[in-house]
Amino acid sequence: MSEGLLAPISPQPIPDMVFDRISRAIIGGKLQPGQRLNVLAVAEEMGVSQTSVREAFLRLERHGLLVKFPRRATLVRTWNRTDLMEIASLRASLEGLAARLACANLTAEDSAALSATIAEMEAAVRREDHDALIELDLAFHRQIWAIADHRLLEQTLDGMKLRTRLFMTIVRGYDVVDYPSQHRQLLDALRSGDAEIAEQCAISHVVEPAELALEAMPDQEGLVAAAVALRTQAGY
C-alpha cells in the first residue's frame, strides 16, 4: 500500500476510529475498488493493533465496503450496475416515504434549517469542495428523516449511510453545480404541503443522478433495461 493514504492514529488504537478512517478512504477514492488490503500492512501504517484492524475490516464487510475471499486477501469492493440499482431503488423508496411524512410535519423552523443547509451547499460549490457537498447532501436528508418522525425509517436510512455516501461518490459525475437547486426543489416540494409531490420529488432526486451514473458505466449492454428496472423498483 502506498504511503500516506491512512494517517497514524495516536495514542491508543481505537477500532471505531480505524473503521472511520478506512471507510472515508474508500468513499473518498483514496482506496480504489479491487485494491487489496492487508491487516498487518494497514495496522503498521495506521499505528494500531492488528486486532483493531480486523474488527474494522469485519464491520466494513458488513457495510458492503470490503469483501473477503476464503484464504485470500481482503479487497475493496468493486461496485457494478446491479449494486448501484439496488442502492438507488431502495434509497429512493425510503427517501420518498420520508419526504411524504416530513411534508405533514414541516415547521417554519424546520424549513429555515433546511434552507440554511442549502446555503452551505452553495458555498461548497463556490469552493469546489465536493467532499463537503456529499456531507451536506447527507446532512440535508438526515434533517428530513428527523422531521418525518418515523424512528424505524430513520434507523433504516441511517444504517445505509455508508452505502449512501458511496452512492454519492459514484454519481459525482452529476453536475455538482446543480446540487443546491436540486435540494431547493425538494424543499419547495415539502413546503407545498402536497405529500404526493414531495414523495415523487424525493424519488426523482435519487433516481435521476443514478441513471446518469448507469450511463457512464462500462458495458452498455442492457442499459435501457437497467434504467427501466431502476425506475420500476423505485416506484418512479
Feature-to-residue mapping (PLM):
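Conserved amphipathic alpha-helical segments that form helical-bundle/coiled-coil interaction surfaces
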Residues: 87, 108-169, 181-188, 197-207
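Short linear motifs at protein or domain termini
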Residues: 1-100, 104, 109, 214-236
